[in-house]
Amino acid sequence: MDKVDKSLDTWREELTDEQFHVCRLGGTERPFTGAYHDSKTPGIYHCACCGEALFDSDAKYDSGSGWPSYFQPINDEVIASLDDYSHGMHRIEVKCAKCDAHLGHVFPDGPRPTGLRYCINSLSLKLVPRD
């Protein structure tokens, strides 16, 4: 996978203010406000910054958290994980492996088959519906 390397100024020009805050500065959208938190449209969720395919709607479920939740990414290579100690707690941050966009966090309280909950900001995603 070829990495996307752009300056913050370039990202700021290409993204909405809200997308820039979440994807490039690591912000979080308020729960139950994102476009995809309750979407049931079949399709593939892509990175809003670089277009990389990240999650299939078949792995999406309602976690009750207010953010889109998935039990697995399309494959392990599309997601980068790193320790996040912000806000006085330890979490695992997930980013797009291609462009380093902040997506959200992964928690060990998801459903089978993985037991994982990828809690993702809608602003980090773009849904491409299935035909």
UniProtKB/Swiss-Prot annotation:
Its EC number is 1.8.4.12. PANTHER family: METHIONINE SULFOXIDE REDUCTASE, METHIONINE-R-SULFOXIDE REDUCTASE B1. Its cofactor is Zn(2+). Zn(2+) binds at C47, C50, C96, C99. Pfam families: SelR. The active site is at C119. The keyword Oxidoreductase applies. GO terms for molecular function: peptide-methionine (R)-S-oxide reductase activity; zinc ion binding. GO terms for cellular component: cytoplasm. Belongs to the MsrB Met sulfoxide reductase family. SUPFAM superfamilies: Mss4-like (SSF51316). InterPro entries: Met_Sox_Rdtase_MsrB (IPR028427), Met_Sox_Rdtase_MsrB_dom (IPR002579), Mss4-like_sf (IPR011057). It catalyses: L-methionyl-[protein] + [thioredoxin]-disulfide + H2O = L-methionyl-(R)-S-oxide-[protein] + [thioredoxin]-dithiol. NCBIfam families: peptide-methionine (R)-S-oxide reductase MsrB. Keywords: Metal-binding, Oxidoreductase, Zinc. It comes from Ectopseudomonas mendocina (strain ymp). Residues 8-130 form the MsrB domain. Binds 1 zinc ion per subunit. The zinc ion is important for the structural integrity of the protein. This is Peptide methionine sulfoxide reductase MsrB. GO terms for biological process: protein repair; response to oxidative stress.
